[in-house]
């Protein structure tokens, strides 16, 4: 009887504990810094987190971290993202993807580059992983949970990294949208027909989202230096010039949205609620990766 009471009390205490969240920022090849941090943690078997939120390259880094594949993300960044097949500006002139995410993620099916989704699902357990994506229709951030099924997980990662103009209209996620999206469930049926783009457009630093989901200690791995500020004025000027030339105003609208969302999150981190601790991890020097 005493043993049962003790177990019950322990369970209640565990439920009452505030969540610890890990957020991995995007940043393309700059994600190699995040990969290094997570690899160091894997060496120490360090994983105290309850909630994971990844944006763009950050979602790939978190997946390999949960898969316990030390060195995996670094190999992909060095091997695939620098391959001439991955980025070809000339493909855009032929109406094709400038950044070939299809080729990139097909490569992750090969034996020597395979993501261990089974281990990732097992190590995640009852915890929560959210992969951010931006709806091309309403331009809102969606926070999507992989089911553990390999193809679905891979498509979520692709959508989270699909930059407009570079990867055309985006990724269609039907039939994988469900009530786990952060937006109202009444919107899900409509969103079944939508395309999804890079999560960094609407949720570049989803710190506020982690807080709203109950995290009271939030660790953020950044891919820019501590003094970085979004240059929204510069993007506004670029948009004016590009619109006058008739060049991709929609893409620039996305960039402006990204800058504003970034500034909003920086402001939240600079002026956080009194009941949250936010820890940011930066590189000592500015990263020169693309």
Where would I find each of the regions flagged by the language model?
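Patatin-like phospholipase
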Residues: 1-55, 63-290
């Amino acid at each position: 009887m005493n043993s049962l009471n003790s177990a019950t009390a322990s369970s209640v205490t565990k439920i009452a504990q505030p969540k610890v969240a890990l957020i991995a920022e995007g940043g393309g090849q700059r994600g190699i810094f995040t990969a290094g941090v997570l690899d160091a943690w894997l060496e120490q078997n360090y994983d105290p987190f309850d909630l994971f939120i990844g944006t763009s390259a950050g979602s790939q880094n978190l997946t390999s971290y949960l898969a316990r594949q030390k060195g995996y993300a670094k190999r992909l960044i060095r091997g695939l993202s620098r391959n001439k097949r991955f980025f070809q500006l000339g493909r855009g002139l032929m109406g094709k993807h400038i950044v070939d995410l299809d080729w990139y993620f097909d490569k992750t099916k090969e034996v020597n580059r395979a993501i261990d989704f089974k281990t990732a699902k097992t190590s995640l357990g009852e915890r929560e992983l959210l992969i951010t994506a931006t709806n091309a229709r309403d331009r809102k951030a969606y926070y999507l949970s992989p089911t553990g099924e390999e193809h679905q997980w891979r498509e979520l990662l692709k959508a989270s990294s699909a930059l407009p103009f570079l990867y055309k209209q985006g990724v269609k996620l039907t039939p994988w949208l469900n009530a786990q999206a952060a937006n109202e469930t009444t919107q899900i049926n409509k969103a079944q027909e939508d395309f999804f783009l890079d999560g960094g457009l609407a949720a570049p630093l989803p710190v506020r989202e982690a807080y709203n989901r109950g995290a009271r200690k939030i660790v953020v791995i950044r891919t820019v230096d501590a003094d970085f500020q979004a240059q929204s004025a510069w993007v506004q000027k670029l948009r004016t010039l590009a619109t006058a030339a008739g060049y991709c105003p929609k893409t620039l609208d996305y960039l402006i949205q990204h800058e504003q969302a970034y500034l909003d999150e920086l402001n939240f981190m600079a002026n956080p609620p009194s009941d949250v601790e936010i820890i940011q991890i930066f590189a000592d020097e500015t990263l020169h990766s693309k």
